Amino acid sequence: MTGDNMEKYIEETVISKPNYCVPATLEMVLKHHGVFSLTQDDIASQLQIIPNEEYVDPVMWGAQIRKDTINDFFFFFFIALHETYIPINHIIDEYMLAEKVISLLNENITIICGYNYSYLYGNHESTYRHVSIIVGISTDYSNVTLLDPGPKNAGYNTVRIDSLFDAIKAGKDGLWCIS
């Protein structure tokens, strides 16, 4: 543990282009693991990016990640990383989420979480989905630090773990664990 938080070090915040939160987050993960040759644009070209057009349901904006999408991406570029997905319905409550985050950070596993962005910040009507990297947890396990690719509110943000748990549930997502 370092200071008041257990933190995973990420070298650089990559600011997301609109609807590129997944590519920007993956660029940060790749840089953390020593892969500097791919940008969010390169990553986006390999993933299906759906623009925020009026005729498209906002739930469908951005990258549509399915089973093995990330592993297929790693395989295509000969990147020696592996993604294991933990759906939120496999985690009972925020206490179990805290235990899982601590365990994964202790194992030096990068944790990307998918969640309902608006829900996390109090708007329970919106369906805007987003991803960030969980980089730390407070010593009392009540707060987590997210590295958010933005573009809005990019950078390190501390949120309550119970709010994050609820936002992950609202987004029907989970933890993308990369090692």
Predicted regions and their residues:
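Generic structural signal of hydrophobic/aromatic residues within well-ordered alpha-helices
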Residues: 43-44, 101, 164
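A broad, low-specificity signal marking well-ordered, structured residues that form hydrophobic/aromatic
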Residues: 44-47, 111, 132, 144
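Noncatalytic regulatory segments and standalone regulatory/sensor domains
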Residues: 1, 106, 116, 121-128, ...
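Active-site-adjacent structural segments surrounding the nucleophilic cysteine of cysteine proteases
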Residues: 1-73, 117, 125, 140-141
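Short coil/turn linker and secondary-structure boundary residues
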Residues: 1, 38, 92, 96, ...
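Hydrophobic, well-ordered secondary-structure segments
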Residues: 26, 98, 131, 143-144
